[in-house]
Amino acid sequence: MADGVPAREPRFTAPMDGRSTFGRVRRIHFVGIGGAGMGGIAEVLHNLGFTITGSDVRSGAVVERLVGLGVTVQIGHDPVHVQGMDAVVVSTAVTEDNPEVQAARQQRIPVVPRAEMLAELMRFRHGVAVAGTHGKTTTTSLLASCLAEGELDPTFVIGGRLISAGAHARLGAGPYLVAEADESDASFLHLKPMMAAVTNVDADHLGTYGGDFEALRRTFIEFLHHLPFYGLAVLCIDDPEVRRLRGEIGRPVLTYGFSEDADVRVSGMEADGHRTRFRIEEGDGAAFAVELSLPGRHNVLNAAAAIALARELGVDVAAIQRALSSFQGIGRRFQVYPDIPLAEGAAALVDDYAHHPRELEATLQAARAAWPERRLVVVFQPHRYSRTRELFDDFARVLSGTDALVLTEVYAAGEARLPGADGRALASAVRDRGGAQPIFAESLDEVPGLLAGLLRDDDVVLTLGAGSIGGLPAQLGGGLTAGGGA
């Protein structure tokens, strides 16, 4: 102390871990904390010792978990919630006119996008990011499970609930942070991982890219160039767009897939009910068998990405085999529920987040592989009018191949209705193709009653979509009676 002036606490300290990571920031508020990506980051920061609060328009499983951990969550948005905060984190679903965002800006509290906060967490660990239009959540979950089985104790932030952990996120003591890299709003450009996988590149979220697929593709290239020159890009060579990327990436590349020229090659795939067996052949001649507790070719590719990443991080083959064989799954990713009791017999029930034609097709193929002799009854809730319009013909083509179909109105996700892109129009297009004859449901409330008159013993029900349909399986678990619904 000189002249009576006390020394200040250092803004940054070394080593930069725990609460020292963010300097003097101690109190962080999350606007829209109930989202899977938001809640996971909030949980990790809470476990690091930060004071976390949040708000959302409604409660839910993520909010309930956080409250159980001691996080204060308010239902509804109010400027008072950000008073005294050092930072405010927002998801892309939160608009600038949100009263908490406006109050934070007026008080000069930093307003931080969710992906930027994830990037800050990643900066002080070895970040491993999984990108791609489809398969991010499953691949990230499989990788986290492999690292955990290999005793690397990873931190992970996942868009789905890892059933074995009962959470979307976990703070580990190990050096690796595994997370999804979200291209839907181009926010993955905030991330600068050490390693990154790209599972596929498909036409989705084109509104973010001005309707230009090439702009989406260029953004993936930009993301991969956020890797350091000594990093690694792990690419699915089976995907034609990812194959195109390979020659434009100025970083070390490792490829995987069923293709003959893959560095990590999948062969000998065999379906066995809900499980799948296959072999992995590596470029140095090493080969080993894998049994995966998930069905479907798409999940084998997801597992191959996780294997390629885990092997590069030093996880031994035995640990990988144990992790994939015992993997308990992720919420809403081919999640198998108890059978639905019927008046006579029962029907199997599977729930999945699939909301893009390519995802629907992969999920249906997996179900047919698991239950080749059984009738598939699909309940599909389209997600967003814009996506339904952009991919209308593909949706109609895939859905017309179902055995029986209940199609609901589009889950708007805040969008205005678009003429010719609603649920009725899609049902009509499916009907015109001459395959499945869809039953249209104006709302999800009608679905249990419709299923009561449709289902028969030994059917397999698939509830599919990214919106509110995720709550339907719980309604069906009590059984169905003709005319009475669930």
Curated annotation (Swiss-Prot):
Pfam families: Mur_ligase, Mur_ligase_C, Mur_ligase_M. GO terms for molecular function: ATP binding; UDP-N-acetylmuramate-L-alanine ligase activity. Its EC number is 6.3.2.8. Keywords: ATP-binding, Cell cycle, Cell division, Cell shape, Cell wall biogenesis/degradation, Cytoplasm, Ligase, Nucleotide-binding, Peptidoglycan synthesis. InterPro entries: Mur-like_cat_sf, Mur_ligase_C, Mur_ligase_C_dom_sf, Mur_ligase_cen, Mur_ligase_N, MurCDEF_pg_biosynth, UDP-N-AcMur_Ala_ligase_MurC. It is found in: Cytoplasm. GO terms for biological process: cell division; cell wall organization; peptidoglycan biosynthetic process; regulation of cell shape. One of its GO terms (cellular component) is cytoplasm. Gene3D superfamilies: Mur ligase, C-terminal domain, Mur-like, catalytic domain, NAD(P)-binding Rossmann-like Domain. ATP binds at G132, T133, H134, G135, K136, T137, T138. Pathway: Cell wall biogenesis; peptidoglycan biosynthesis. It catalyses: UDP-N-acetyl-alpha-D-muramate + L-alanine + ATP = UDP-N-acetyl-alpha-D-muramoyl-L-alanine + ADP + phosphate + H(+). Belongs to the MurCDEF family. Cell wall formation. PANTHER family: UDP-N-ACETYLMURAMATE--L-ALANINE LIGASE, UDP-N-ACETYLMURAMATE--L-ALANINE LIGASE-RELATED. This is UDP-N-acetylmuramate--L-alanine ligase. It comes from Halorhodospira halophila (strain DSM 244 / SL1). The gene is murC.
